[in-house]
Amino acid sequence: MTDIPDRKEAVISLWPEFAKAIVSGKKTVEFRRRIPLPALSARIWIYATRPVKSVIGFAYLEAIVQGDVNTLWSRYGREAFLSEQQYRDYFEGTEKATAFLLRDHQPIRPINLDQLKEIRANFQPPQSLTWLRKEETQKLVSLTSQVE
């Protein structure tokens, strides 16, 4: 029987400055244009893109809010750790936005791309997010508890 992802564990790719801000708790909202929606309370593993190329922590999904670009900026912009201009540039050409409200941010010892490929042979950093299967999550968790 194949272990099908249940939308409770996912990896999301972010630029390093935003990834670090999430795991430190400074950034509590992540905005996206179009993205598959995880289950509420899902654990979102934070992958920092180049030059870091590692999972550096996780946070839990408290809520998903979808709506008008202007409304979401007004409501959550202060928690997003980005400028209004960056936000406007990202959402240029669309009227709808999705906000992930994050809680319980946890930095971890970085898990690099080679280690991620040991968990999933064809692992590629996701464009938006990728679901994890139960056995993949277990392997990821075991790597977070290993002593260097």
UniProtKB/Swiss-Prot annotation:
It comes from the Bacteria. Its EC number is 3.1.-.-. It comes from Zymomonas mobilis subsp. mobilis (strain ATCC 10988 / DSM 424 / LMG 404 / NCIMB 8938 / NRRL B-806 / ZM1). The keyword Transmembrane helix does not apply. This is ASCH domain-containing ribonuclease. The keyword RNA-binding applies. Its cofactor is Mn(2+); Ni(2+). Changing K53E: Reduced binding to ssRNA and ssDNA. No effect on ribonuclease activity. Active in the presence of Mn(2+) or Ni(2+) ions. No activity detected with Zn(2+) or Co(2+). GO terms for molecular function: DNA binding; endonuclease activity; exonuclease activity; RNA binding. Residues 13-70 form the ASCH domain.
